[in-house]
């Protein structure tokens, strides 16, 4: 049975935690569409085009994964791609409450769309895009948390913008 799942997020930037979930989801479903949300209210560091490109690079070895940007309601994006499943990651109990509300709202808007929750590998359980950006901003080594191309892109973004530098 062909099952297409959407893994939505802002991915600003994509981390090893995201990449691990994508790879594991790709083993569970016929096709994964990584939907990168425009998310202007979050004021992303990387443009939508940059985030899509970085995610494409990180997932290039996965034949059943496609990366696309989107704006608007997630349920409409899922309908457009004829997906029946949403993949969501849960790092901690604090994620659960928000994700539970989101899953119920999505189910109300699109009753045939199921949410499937995956927990991270232990070594990725603390990684978030926000923490990775904070470490990179202060010149820390993020190579253990992101793909080398993402680490390089962060270095370029923060070059000359670090606290204490003019």
Swiss-Prot record:
Annotated GO CC locations: cytoplasm
Catalytic activity reported: (R)-4'-phosphopantetheine + ATP + H(+) = 3'-dephospho-CoA + diphosphate
InterPro entries linked: Cyt_trans-like, PPAT, Rossmann-like_a/b/a_fold
Keyword terms of this UniProt record: ATP-binding, Coenzyme A biosynthesis, Cytoplasm, Magnesium, Nucleotide-binding, Nucleotidyltransferase, Transferase
Subunit structure: Homohexamer.
Cross-referenced HAMAP family: PPAT_bact (MF_00151)
Family per similarity comment: Belongs to the bacterial CoaD family.
Name recorded for this polypeptide: Phosphopantetheine adenylyltransferase
């Amino acid at each position: 049975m062909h099952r297409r799942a959407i893994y939505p997020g802002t991915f600003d930037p994509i981390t090893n935690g995201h990449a691990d979930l994508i790879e594991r989801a790709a083993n569970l479903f016929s096709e994964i569409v990584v939907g990168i949300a425009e998310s202007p209210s979050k004021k992303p560091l990387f443009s939508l085009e940059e985030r899509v490109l970085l995610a494409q690079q990180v997932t290039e070895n996965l034949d059943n994964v496609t990366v696309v940007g989107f704006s608007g309601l997630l349920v409409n994006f899922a309908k457009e791609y004829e997906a029946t499943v949403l993949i969501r990651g849960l790092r901690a109990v604090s994620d659960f409450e928000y994700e539970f509300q989101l899953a119920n709202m999505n189910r109300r808007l699109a009753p045939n769309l199921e949410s499937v929750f995956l927990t991270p590998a232990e070594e990725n359980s603390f990684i978030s895009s926000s923490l990775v950006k904070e470490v990179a901003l202060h010149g820390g080594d993020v190579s253990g948390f992101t793909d080398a191309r993402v680490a390089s892109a962060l270095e370029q973004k923060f070059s000359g913008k670090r606290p204490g530098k003019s």
